[in-house]
A protein has these predicted regions:
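Nuclease and nuclease-like effector domains acting on nucleic acids or nucleotide cofactors
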Residues: 2-94, 102-165
């Protein structure tokens, strides 16, 4: 049998892509896969606009996408393999913004939304607590908007340990 040169490169490359993008971060199942969910920001929210956007009471609810959007996305992501150990029960996850709306995350970008598990130690409830703290710190000027966003895109668990504990 004659095989075209390089056929094994295609197979190896395809296998590497599958291996390189697991459903969850290798660091911790409470962190999203950084390839699938790198985070995205709302361009309207900048350091100079925080007092007319995120620091205004009710801002987050004014930009939050409808539940019909986030629930449909959660089901697509879970069915598409973005789940923890094959668990596709939607009730085990909260469709969450990696960069929270409270610090100017994009409301609807799939790069900023992921099915965050409730069933792990570092779960949606803990991240919610950090979101509230970082929002307060940005609005009172204790940290910059860029710093707050980095807390979530780098490793929100370390951010929790630094700012919430």
């Amino acid at each position: 049998m004659i095989r075209p040169r390089g056929w094994w490169i295609v197979v190896a490359t395809a296998a590497a892509v599958i291996v390189a993008t697991p459903a969850w971060s290798a660091r911790n199942p409470g962190l999203p896969n950084p390839v699938r969910t790198p985070g995205a920001v709302n361009a309207r929210v900048t350091q100079s606009t925080i007092h007319s956007t995120i620091c205004v009471p009710g801002y987050s609810s004014s930009v939050r996408p409808p539940e019909s959007y986030t629930e449909a996305l959660k089901y697509r992501q879970l069915d598409g393999g973005y789940n923890l150990n094959g668990d596709t029960r939607a009730s085990d996850y909260e469709e969450d913004h990696l960069i929270p709306l409270e610090v100017g995350g994009s409301p609807t970008s799939v790069k900023n939304l992921w099915p965050e598990p409730w069933t792990v130690t570092w779960n949606a409830g803990r991240k919610d607590a950090l979101e509230n703290v970082m929002h307060r710190l940005v609005c009172d000027g204790s940290v910059t908007l860029a710093t707050a966003r980095r807390v979530f895109t780098s490793n929100w668990i370390l951010g929790y340990e630094k700012y919430v504990h």
